[in-house]
Amino acid sequence: MFTLLFRKMRNTKWMVLCLLIGFVMASAMMSTIPIYMNASLQRMLVKDLESFQTEYEIYPGAYNTSYGLKMDISGSEQQKAVENYNNKVEAKFKELGLPEKLDKKYISDEYLYVRSLAVSDGNSQARFTLGGMTDISDHISIKQGRMFTAGKRSDGVYECVATEKAMKSTELAINTVYEIADVFDDNKSIKIEIVGVFDVKDENDAYWAEGLDSQYTAVVFTDYDTMLGDCVDTGVVNITKAVHNYAVDYASMNMTDLASTNEMIAKQKTYFGDNSIGFSMPASDILKDYESRSSQLQLVLWLLQIPVILMIIFYLFMVSQLNVEQERNEIAVFKSRGASRLQIMGIYALESLVLGVLTVIIGPFAGLGLCKVLGASNGFLEFVNRRSLPVHMTIEAVVYAAIAVAVFFVTTMIPIVPATKTTIVEHKQSKAKKKKHALWEKVCLDFILVGGSVGWLYYYNKTQEKLVAEGVTDTTATVNPIMFVASTAFILGLGLFLIRIYPYIIRLLARIGRRVWSPAQYVSLTNIGRSSTGRERFLMLFLVLTVSLGVFFANTARALNRNAEESVAYGVGCDAVLTEQWYSSKIESAQQTTPQSASQAAQSGTKQTSEESDEEDTETTIQYVEPVFERFEKLAGVENVTKVFRKDDVTISSNKMNVPRQQTKSDDEEKTRDDFLDQSVDTSSGKSSTSNVQLMTIVPSDFSKVCKFEDRLLPVQLNNYLNALAEYTPGVILSSSFKSYGLELGDTVECKWGGNEPFEVTVLAFVDYWPGLSPYKEAKNGGYMDFAVMNYDYVNVQTSMEPYEVWFKLKDGASVQEFYDSIDKAGIKPLTLESASQQTIEKKNDPMLQGMNGALTLGFIIIMVMCIIGFLIYWILSIKSRTLQFGILRAMGMKFREIIMMIVYEQLLVSGVAIFAAIFIGGVTSALFVPLFQSIFDASQSVPPFAVIPERSDYLKLYAVIGVMLLTAFVVLGRLIKKIKISQALKLGED
């Protein structure tokens, strides 16, 4: 049997190689799921912890404990208490199983003084703390003198080191011997000498996570073991405090068992509290939050793999079916010559087993390599020079690879079972019989899949609309796997519908042009038209699935990345925005007591009321000194620059407005009987107003050169609005929310804020979006703020000048760092500085987005590789099985060139049509199902709105892959056809 097996595999070595490559890719894909998932989760945790460290300047991996000793215990009891304390902490830390970066112990006596040495006031004695810290010599650098020597010197002196700040605090000097004693018992004393002054070797060292100067201000350090041993034995030094800290190497943490780790940390807090041990772990809250975030990322990554896993299963089934169809005649011969079904199945089972063993060995490591490459993904099929993912081989990866092999084995054996029932006579008879319709055609599976997926999509969208109308956020959408299954089912349904009708279309074409078709064209049309249940349909369905999923993945990734980039560009409004301090006498005097920015001072001015003091009123009419604006035009990389003034809580009022009043429960409670009987005259002249308005004033001509904006967000191009504002300076562009207040185009409204006199403007347009202005910005009353855009020069004449923002457009390819450096060189001290490019980088570094980009890229690569391999397998088998047909055609007089053209026509009619149909189906699927992904990022209120806009570059990448696939196929097929012994085929044809 083994001889027969290896002979069979040798004769079909190229087929076996294609199968092996396909199975390795399938296995690698499956094994990447746990590898990439764990690596993505770990990177997400590391980024969260790094952000925590940057924000709070605390090492997040710190595991800190402390213990206060009793004052009335002997030296031996102190030593025993410290030892017991250290043992408890060490045992508890080991329970967590976290990677250890360092282990530090510290003891101290805070009640020591220097005899016969008074501090500078001359009345009190010099007090200090003696401390001992393990491994301190490895983490400090000596600035003056030398490092202490452990133990007691021959002259009875203990050597110490101290920081310069500690020496100033204690007024001790270097290289001076001091006699020290306990403040509570000065009968005994010991001698110390500070032999060196040190500083921290590395400021970012986790060893000093708690801070050196802040925690050890008046500490003189000696050797830890010497202090705990010899010094305590003298009776002079008494340990009052013990500290045992660990630093966790969070970059190497294992994410697989985080839930149990969080549970143990909670239990340890209770344990340490019961044992009077202080405990803190800054990362504990992050780890809790991470547990929920990781579950969301884990779920999203899993769901993204659903279409790919379904594609792998379909690929394995297709390859197995083609393999069995190719060898069905051989199986029938075995059966007729007396081989049992078990023997025949055993041969194929052994072949699958050999390939399976190789796959289990190779697959996980191939998956590991893929994950390393994907770690540098900055977008869909975009890679940057970023540190690779912390990937490592896991048992889970091998298990997943084994599962893939098991599925492959079962899938391979399923088509063999019915084939072993057929004898050679029955096989020949079946080839002559008319093929029946497949089961899926009889049950109309294509209509069921398309109808079911579209029906679910309709129901889902209606449910979402209802929830949004009720103000409810659908949290279940983030964990709804049906959106992924439905998209794949939609593609599969349309693919099945295509192969249902395609043979009839081909037959119609063959009949219409039967008098004009060349022999090669007619034979191609006839072959495909008659293959109503043949493998051509299977190939078309396979290509539709792979290419459509590729388009779907590309559009999904592009929509997610575009949404991230556009939200940053819209929020900033341009390439960079800068604000700086504007000087005035009022601000300068205020800065002497409490420093505050100009924007804060201006904002405080807007909150004044008529009931406040005159001094407070003057703040609203403060005169600012405008800096020289031309400085900004000379900065490095700047192409254009403009002034943009922004103000919140501006009041817009009009006689025609009817603004719903936000009435609260307290308003009703404050009303009295007199309020309801009040007949006082309304001095507001019937005007209704809203104070929840964001105001932006711009210089239209300059603003058009600087701002970034998507034209699809407005009914007409942005410049049309800017032209209107430039031509009619007392105009205003309002947010569409003002329409609900009753305003119309041409209405006049009154604008006011702070101590400025009100002025009138005319409504020129209503818009939903404007660069830098979010329609979802929350107001103080809990609603959304309206916005208004006016002409800067007009408003500046009507009101007193206030600090404005400076908006920049940078030249193409300009360095942001050089731009920052030029700001420093120009002496500009910005209060705020926003860069769209930097915020985009931060947005793209979001672990969720990175994980999805990696998963989509991985899925696309795997699908395209399977597409190429499946394509090659089909055409290799097709050409090899048609040797007799080629001989017959040659015997009938068809030239070799015409046979080649016949194959080309078949490629176009089968592969070409399937690919073009797949691109169309993928586009339709993207338009219908990609918008559902906004629920993953809670993008219902994102600005701009989540949109699916195909990118030409993504399709070019797809076309490049397809082009390589077709080119490779033509090269391989050309070589195969050349190797066919036409003379033998010709004889077969003549016979």
Regions found by a protein language model. Name each.
Residues G273, F317-S320, N329, L353-N385, ...:
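Small-residue-rich transmembrane alpha-helices
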Residues Y804-V806, K829-G922, S926-P931, A939-P945, ...:
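C-terminal transmembrane helical bundles of large multi-pass transporters
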Residues W14-L19, M25-T32, Y36, S260-D274, ...:
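Alpha-helical transmembrane segments, especially those used as permease/efflux helices
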Residues T12, S40, F314-G356, T422, ...:
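Interfacial "coupling" helices/loops that link adjacent transmembrane helices in transporter permeases
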Residues E465-V472, A477-T488, G493-N720:
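Juxtamembrane segments of multi-pass membrane proteins
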Residues F2-I313, L322, A376-V384, T394-A397, ...:
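Membrane transport/envelope proteins' first extracytoplasmic loop
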Residues F2, L342-G346, L350, H437, ...:
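Alpha-helical membrane-protein architecture signal
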Residues T420-A438, S940, L976-D991:
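Short cytosolic juxtamembrane segments of multi-pass membrane proteins
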